[in-house]
């Protein structure tokens, strides 16, 4: 039976319409850490690419790229076009009470206007003291095209809150063999030992670690003054 919904999307600097793919192809992309990256073991932890890729963006760079793979960016923003409202909800649960929630909603009330939002929560209390991560990302997007297809407007609002605790590693490897420390959060670490800790998926605070926040608002307006193709 033919699908009743037709949905395509475009990237910000592209004119190519891409059909929305809901199959299991590239299923590994549902995990927030790409297969070419090395990370510290829990979802949301610091990571770096095993494939060399220089930063070619012009301008000053602060050098903080440890958590880049967990951020929403302008470049990856999509503008959808659909004949019906479309929503997608994803929930993933892993060991150590790791969880990831993703929400997407988009709709096109008119053929020349569409809007939607993305949201993602990554929460990983993990096993050791002061190792938890809690990342929140959201994105609002909208685009409009005039009836004569000359005027166009694009709007994107992207926000990221990155929280990642740091414990400096355990004090000694031999403690992992201690039968009295089967609960790994009882193993002492180099930073944050005094923190009362219980693995809790709803724990979002960071006492010792990194908290990075950024907000980007993007508006683009264009007008085509070219002659219509004959």
Enumerate the language-model features and the residues they cover.
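Residues on the lipid-exposed face of transmembrane beta-strands in outer-membrane beta-barrel proteins
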Residues: 103-107, 117, 140-144, 219-225
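Residues that define the transmembrane beta-barrel architecture of outer-membrane proteins
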Residues: 83, 97-101, 134-138, 213-217
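Short strand-turn segments of transmembrane beta-barrel domains in outer membranes
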Residues: 60-62, 73-79, 83-104, 126-127
């Amino acid at each position: 039976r033919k699908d009743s919904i037709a949905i395509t999307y475009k990237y910000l600097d592209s004119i190519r319409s891409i059909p929305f793919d809901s199959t299991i192809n590239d299923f590994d992309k549902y995990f927030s850490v790409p297969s070419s990256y090395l990370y510290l073991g829990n979802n949301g932890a610091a990571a770096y690419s095993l494939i060399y890729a220089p930063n070619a963006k012009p301008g000053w760079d602060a050098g903080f790229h440890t958590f880049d793979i967990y951020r929403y960016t302008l470049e990856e923003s999509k503008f959808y076009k659909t004949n019906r409202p479309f929503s997608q909800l994803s929930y993933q649960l892993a060991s150590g009470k790791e969880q990831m929630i993703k929400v997407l909603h988009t709709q096109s009330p008119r053929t020349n206007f569409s809007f939607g939002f993305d949201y993602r929560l990554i929460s990983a209390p993990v096993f050791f003291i002061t190792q938890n991560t809690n990342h929140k990302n959201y994105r609002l997007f909208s685009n409009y095209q005039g009836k004569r297809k000359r005027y166009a407007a694009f709007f994107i609002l992207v926000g990221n809150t990155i929280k990642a605790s740091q414990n400096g590693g355990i004090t000694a490897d031999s403690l992992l063999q201690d039968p009295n420390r089967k609960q790994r959060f009882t193993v002492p670490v180099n930073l944050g030992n005094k923190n009362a800790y219980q693995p809790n998926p709803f724990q979002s605070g960071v006492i010792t670690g990194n908290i990075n926040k950024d907000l980007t608002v993007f508006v683009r307006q264009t007008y085509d003054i070219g002659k219509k193709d004959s």
